[in-house]
Amino acid sequence: NSLRGKILRLDVSKLKLEPDIIAYGIRNPWGVTIDSKDRMFILDCGGAEIEAVYLLNDLYSGIPVNLGWPVFEGSMRIKKDPLMFKDVLAPIFEYNIRPGCLTAGLYLDDIESFLFADFYGTIRLLKQQENGDWYLIHEYKQEESIWGFGLDKKTKKIFVAPNNLELEISVD
């Protein structure tokens, strides 16, 4: 009955908080963001091998989504237990952990793309294809660590913390 490794929804308008489990089987979610379509992107730091980005398309289904930990790290099976963790959601993107450590993500409605970064300075941009698959369309490496993103919706500028780098992104 532990809440470890889970993402919860809490209705703060109720006198008694009863957590609604949205997802479980998560190792170390450093970044979580919800887009204008109520989809949740989860950046899950791996243990030894894989950094993974997950997409939950329906936050209100009432059925928790299984992301696979501790049997899976991303899409890689790390434990052999056929009874544990059936129906595991596959990540929309993953990469080898060295170097890595996912820290920040931001869905960009204007260009229908997901921007994310890791602590070691790599910024990546994903785009969804018509068949639903996601693919990497851009990767940029900078010298400094990245802790988070901020979007100025009026100017459409993206700011990167902690160094206040400004990004301008367009997808043709």
What does each of the following model-derived ranges do?
Residues 1-135:
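Beta-propeller domain segments
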